[in-house]
Regions:
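N-terminal, leucine/charged-rich tether regions that mediate assembly and partner docking
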Residues: 1-97
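Peripheral peptide segments
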Residues: 67-70, 113-115, 162-163, 167, ...
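Extended assembly-interface/linker segments at domain junctions
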Residues: 75-164
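Amphipathic alpha-helical coiled-coil segments
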Residues: 176-179, 183-186, 206-216
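Short, charged, amphipathic alpha-helical segments
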Residues: 196-207
Length: 216
């Protein structure tokens, strides 16, 4: 699985309780940790020292956490809680019944200037047999390695041939997502509308939204 260099291996088990005990976590989220997660392993530490590359300006380390699940689904709030508690970028590998799925958040430093991070969006692969999940370490510094991993996992969701930055690609993807949501909502509303003049107005608005989506 993954095929990362031996120099990056860490292989330590983390008690899942560390992510919710003595923290301000809702009873619902605590129950998700208990019910959905079986084990958490810290598999790799991707860093300048373990990869023999240059440090990054925004990314110092990428931790690779294997999360073994009781069933092949996990509430995204769990990943956000773990990301919130770890002051580094994290690559999650979810495993269940011989299959794996990679998740990674687009993680930025919080505007407050503290060491805290905020995750704007998660990207993930499809579920696949464990031996088929392969990610490559590409880049001459940690910032480039992180960008490469996000783009590999996001696949077609993030544009790769325009020369835009990762931040710009993520923002473009978020705009697409919002437009698609608006279009779906307006289509549903138009189907329920009885008045012809209102249907025509909505159809004109739909065309505008679809044109905006096409140019992104």
């Amino acid at each position: 699985m993954l095929g990362f260099p031996v120099s990056t291996e860490y292989n330590k088990r983390i008690p899942k309780q560390k992510f919710y005990e003595n923290l301000d976590v809702s009873p619902t989220l605590r129950r998700v940790f208990v019910d959905q997660i079986r084990l958490v392993y810290w598999r790799n530490k991707l860093a300048a020292s373990t990869l023999n590359i240059a440090a990054g300006e925004a990314v110092t380390e990428i931790e690779v956490f294997e999360v073994r699940l009781n069933e092949p689904k996990l509430d995204e709030a769990v990943l956000k809680q773990i990301d919130k508690e770890i002051p580094y970028h994290i690559l999650f590998i979810l495993t269940c019944d011989g299959k794996s799925q990679a998740w990674i958040g687009y993680k930025e430093a919080a505007a407050s200037g503290s060491s805290a991070f905020k995750v704007n969006r998660y990207y993930h692969t499809d579920w696949m047999p464990e031996d088929e999940l392969q990610l490559h370490i590409d880049g001459l510094n940690m910032d480039a390695v992180y960008e490469s991993l996000v783009r590999q996992i996001a696949g077609d969701k993030l544009q790769t041939d325009s020369g835009e930055s990762l931040k710009e690609s993520v923002e473009r993807d978020e705009k697409k997502k919002q437009l698609e949501k608006q279009i779906a909502a307006l289509e549903n509303k138009m189907r329920r509308e009885k008045q012809l003049n209102r249907q025509m107005e909505m159809n004109a608005e739909l065309k505008k939204l679809r044109r905006s989506l096409e140019v992104l």
